[in-house]
């Protein structure tokens, strides 16, 4: 049987560039090499696109995927024809953060009419923007913690007023977050005015729009969602931390976080979380995959935190492990996502774009 031609796109002009390399290594190694011919495209930190070789062997070190300058091709040439001279059956973007999971590259795939894994333009962009995401969750009646948002220009013009607004609406501790980054990049836990100002100024290095959320003493539980119009969910898992909060360093470097799968919670709460995860998936018109993150308090109150349209996706990340607990292997999950991409593309092809 002829192999399907899949293009893995990784790297990206983002603070989460190195995370993307780890993800690409993990996915490439897990893909069924008898079923798929795997091409690669590396996007440098400066935004340059480099066409990599077809890969059929195991990648032992993610640094091998950090390509140097090679033959220059146009982006459309890279995306439209595989190394074997055939059109791709699907592209698989493994990009985190701005320019990768925020709808921009998804728009490129749409314009070039290429099947791609994961969420579409609308879902990717709204899931990346924490403020827009919260506004959409509100339309579905999903419970959320109080928050304040503002722009860099507003903070620079009215710093004292912004601080007063935060302290008037929220109580310490609070969490300062760039609106458009993932992997906990730029997030700070703030316990007083001094740390709040420092946290704001740190976060503004990564984004022009910030969200400041009420801190809460709660467990962090997550549900994986997979599908298109009729998504399936997993049992919830829990992020168990040996640190004050789950930042970039504890996620990827220190090993101070462990995942409990499934989470030790009642069947009633499990069911409620899974239902809310589907509501969140639908609120942002998602497809393919999403990880829905929640806070669960001691008195069993549930608050949705966010949806992640391109969740951590190494073999040891929460999303694949949640599915492994449900009996779906990492390799099978990748195959399912590719098939969902082709299914969605086929459905779009049946849409009329002109009147008879």
UniProtKB/Swiss-Prot annotation:
It catalyses: 2 D-alanine + ATP = D-alanyl-D-alanine + ADP + phosphate + H(+). Residues 134-339 form the ATP-grasp domain. Gene3D superfamilies: 3.40.50.20, ATP-grasp fold, A domain, ATP-grasp fold, B domain. InterPro entries: ATP-grasp (IPR011761), ATP_grasp_subdomain_1 (IPR013815), D-Ala_lig_Van_CS (IPR000291), D_ala_D_ala (IPR005905), Dala_Dala_lig_C (IPR011095), Dala_Dala_lig_N (IPR011127), PreATP-grasp_dom_sf (IPR016185). Keywords: ATP-binding, Cell shape, Cell wall biogenesis/degradation, Cytoplasm, Ligase, Magnesium, Manganese, Metal-binding, Nucleotide-binding, Peptidoglycan synthesis. ATP binds at residues 167-222. One of its GO terms (cellular component) is cytosol. Binds 2 magnesium or manganese ions per subunit. Mg(2+) 1 binds at residues 293, 306. One of its GO terms (molecular function) is metal ion binding. It is found in: Cytoplasm. Belongs to the D-alanine--D-alanine ligase family. HAMAP family: Dala_Dala_lig. This is D-alanine--D-alanine ligase. It comes from Macrococcus caseolyticus (strain JCSC5402). The gene is ddl.
């Amino acid at each position: 049987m002829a192999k399907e031609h899949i293009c893995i796109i990784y790297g990206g002009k983002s603070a989460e560039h190195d995370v993307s390399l780890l993800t690409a290594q993990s996915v490439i190694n897990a893909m069924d090499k008898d079923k798929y011919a795997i091409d690669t495209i590396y996007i440098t930190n400066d935004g340059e696109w480099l066409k990599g070789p077809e890969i059929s062997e195991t990648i032992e070190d993610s640094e091998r995927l950090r390509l140097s300058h090679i033959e220059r091709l146009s982006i459309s040439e890279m995306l439209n024809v595989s190394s074997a001279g055939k059109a791709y059956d699907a592209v698989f973007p493994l990009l985190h953060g701005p320019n990768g999971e925020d709808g921009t590259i998804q728009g490129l795939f749409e314009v070039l009419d290429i099947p791609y894994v994961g969420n579409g333009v609308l879902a990717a962009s709204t899931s990346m923007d924490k403020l827009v995401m919260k506004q959409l969750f509100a339309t579905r009646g999903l419970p959320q913690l109080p928050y304040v948002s503002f722009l860099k220009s507003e903070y620079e013009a009215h710093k004292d007023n912004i601080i007063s607004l935060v302290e008037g609406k929220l109580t310490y501790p609070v969490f300062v977050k760039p609106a458009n980054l993932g992997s906990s990049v730029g997030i700070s836990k703030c316990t007083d005015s001094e740390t709040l100002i420092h946290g704001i100024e740190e976060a503004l290095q990564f984004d022009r729009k910030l969200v400041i959320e009420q801190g809460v003493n709660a467990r962090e539980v997550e549900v994986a969602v997979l599908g298109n119009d009729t998504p399936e969910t997993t049992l919830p898992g829990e992020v168990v931390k040996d640190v004050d909060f789950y930042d970039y360093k504890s996620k990827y470097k220190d090993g101070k976080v462990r995942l409990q799968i499934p989470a030790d919670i009642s069947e009633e709460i499990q069911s409620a979380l899974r239902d809310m995860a589907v509501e969140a998936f639908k609120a942002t018109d998602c497809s393919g995959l999403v990880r829905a993150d929640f806070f669960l308090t001691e008195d069993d109150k549930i608050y949705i935190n966010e949806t992640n349209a391109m969740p951590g996706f190494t073999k040891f990340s929460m999303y694949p492990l949640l599915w492994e607990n449900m009996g779906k292997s990492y390799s099978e999950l990748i195959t399912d996502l590719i098939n969902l991409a082709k299914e969605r593309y086929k459905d779009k092809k049946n849409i009329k774009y002109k009147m008879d």
